């Protein structure tokens, strides 16, 4: 699958759907906290870069962050988080639930509905 810029915007916004899709700053913190929960499973030499990207998990700034960092860095960060999230026997139940729900929403986003719209954008 080839990722497009809008895919990265969508991925960065998925956390908002997971916790209620809100402009509430506490929700933004909750999204970042969930990403930080993966820190123990991210290779040590990659933690700083991943956490810097995690800090950009904000509904208002995600599109700007994509432009600022570029698609390659986002692709890398998502790949690292995915590998961390899918490490065998490593995730606790909260992390597993978060990852499962994010992936469910992500794949819903990939499939247009009968009107040609993507679920995660509705």
Named regions from a protein language model:
Residues 1-122:
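Small-residue-enriched hydrophobic alpha-helices in membranes
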